Amino acid sequence: MDKLALQFENGLKDKMLRAKKECKYNPTRFNQMLAQYGGVETAKRLISNGITTGATSDGYTTLYLCGRLDLTMEHSVCKPEYRDLFTSEEICYCNNLMGVK
C-alpha cells in the first residue's frame, strides 16, 4: 500500500473512532471492510454501490442524522489531498452527497 492510500485509511480509522465516541455509532461492517479490503478499496466499493443503487450507505445516513458528515468516508474522498486515489465519477458522487457544487 502506498503512503497516500495508507494515510487515507488511517484517516478513516480515526473518523470511525470519533463516530463511535461522538455519535454512539459503531460501524461494524465498515470496520470489517477496512480490514478485508483496505481504505481505498472499501471507499470504492461503497461509492460504486451508491452510484448503482442510488442509496447512501448506512454509515452515511447515521452520521447525517448525527449532524456529522465530516466523519463520513465520502467527506474524506472529497479532500484535495486524496483526489489521486479516486476517479472523477467517484469524487463527483461524494461531492454531491456533501452538497459541494
Give names to the regions the model predicted.
Residues Y64-K101:
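Amphipathic alpha-helical binding modules
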Residues K3, K21-K24, F30, M73, ...:
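Short, well-ordered helical secondary-structure segments
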Residues M1-E22:
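Charged, compositionally biased N-terminal leader segments and the immediate start
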Residues N10-K13, Y37, A55-T56, S88-K101:
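Compositionally biased terminal segments of proteins
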Residues E9, K15, N31, T42-A43, ...:
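Functionally constrained cores in energy, signaling, and assembly domains
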Residues M16-R68:
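Amphipathic alpha-helical packing elements
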